[in-house]
Design a protein with these regions (language model features):
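Short helix-capping/linker turns of helical repeat alpha-solenoids
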Residues: 2-6, 11, 24-27, 40-42, ...
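Aromatic (phenylalanine/tyrosine) cluster motif
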Residues: 2-3, 19, 36, 63, ...
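Short hydrophobic transmembrane-like helices used for membrane targeting/insertion
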Residues: 16, 52-55, 88, 100, ...
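Terminal, low-structured helical/coil segments at or just beyond the last alpha-helical repeat
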Residues: 345-364
Length: 364
């Protein structure tokens, strides 16, 4: 009552006083709560060590909440030497009593092989237990396991079922993933309108992936009335969070004056942000900017450098352009052999310009 001010004036100090009286008499719930007060420094001087002392007393009595929190303390090294193995041990005790957060943690640890031998099957088992109790994170994780057939037999329908349960609870990541499923018609009947609906829910929670996809839907008029202005708005939100795809898309809109006043300088700025994160599309676009001297001083050397970064990632246009640079000796020493090498890579991906260039080069 003193802890949350129910029926009395809230007081952490008095809550600690009464928790301690009960804890010293062996009450497990009070011991756990007293540990919580020490952990968070509420009504008492903060002490991870004393927190562990009291939580351990409760955990040893089989109190599931304490067992979970003790596992958490071992997992993070709070008041004890960090030990993933001991974390698993205590999570397991709580999970076997049906403690949902412990079940979720166990699923995660089995999926990553943290503190325990990796097992996708056991991960799925624990995610399933937590999911059936309504845990949104577990529902989303289980959905992804069904989507990719990890630890369970692949089923897009079951994937959609579990992801939808999490999405309906407001889980942003699940809302985004459900949007992707509706956009692609995986496990559900394809519906661009429903894809937009779910992307919007996740985007409004600030999820950059969803903001970027929503921007693309508005830009293409897919499932929603086309609006370059709204596309720009959502790309901007995601780009400002550092989402590389959105940064590139935003750069492209500035580059072409789509939904915004054209600005090669701003296009270059956003392309660069995405390119520095390793996005091949942006690296290619930057290469073109340097090659043509648009928004920046022309530099064949810098063009080659950016084309090369994208080409090494398998970006066909960049491979062709790099072959062209070697073919013409622009920004690099002329080399038929290297031109042929890069033309070949692009041609193998079906790039028609590369195929023509390769034929011409072979006929020289």
């Amino acid at each position: 009552m003193y802890y949350d001010g129910t029926g009395v004036e809230q007081s952490d100090e008095k809550a600690v006083e009464w928790y301690k009286k009960a804890a010293e008499q062996g009450d497990a719930a009070a011991q756990c709560n007293l540990g919580y007060m020490y952990k968070n420094g509420r009504g008492v001087e903060q002490s991870d060590e004393k927190a562990v002392k009291w939580v351990l007393k409760a955990a040893d009595q089989g109190y599931a909440d304490a067992q979970y929190h003790l596992g958490y303390m071992y997992s993070n090294g709070f008041g004890v030497e960090e030990s993933d193995e001991k974390a698993v041990e205590w999570y397991l005790k709580a999970a076997e009593q049906g403690y949902v957060t412990a079940q979720l943690c166990l699923g995660t640890m089995y999926s990553q092989g943290t503190g325990v031998e990796e097992s996708d099957e056991k991960a799925a088992e624990w995610f399933q237990k937590a999911a059936e109790q309504g845990d949104a994170s577990a529902q989303c994780a289980l959905g992804l396991m069904y989507k990719y057939g990890i630890g369970v037999e692949q089923s897009y329908e079951k994937a959609a079922k579990w992801v939808q349960k999490a999405a309906e609870q407001g889980d942003a990541d699940a809302q985004y993933k459900l949007g992707v499923m509706y956009e692609n018609g995986r496990g559900v009947e394809q519906s661009y309108e429903k894809a937009v609906e779910w992307y919007l829910k996740a985007a409004e929670q600030g999820l950059a992936d969803a903001q970027c996809n929503l921007g693309a839907m508005y830009g293409n008029g897919t499932g929603v009335e086309q609006s370059y202005e709204k596309a720009l708005e959502w790309f901007q939100k995601a780009a400002e969070q550092g989402f590389a795809d959105a940064q590139c898309d935003l750069g492209y809109m500035y580059d072409n004056g789509t939904g915004v006043e054209q600005s090669y300088e701003k296009a270059l700025e956003w392309y660069l942000k995405a390119a520095e994160q390793g996005l091949a599309d942006a690296q290619y676009f930057l290469g073109e900017k340097y090659y043509n001297g648009i928004g920046v001083a022309r530099s064949y050397e810098k063009a080659v450098a950016w084309f090369l970064k994208a080409a090494k990632q398998g970006f066909a246009y960049a491979q062709f352009r790099l072959g062209f640079m070697y073919d013409c000796g622009r920004g690099v020493e002329q080399s038929d052999a290297k031109a042929r090498e890069w033309y070949q890579k692009a041609a193998e991906q079906g790039d028609e310009l590369a195929i023509e260039a390769l034929d011409w080069l072979n006929d020289k």
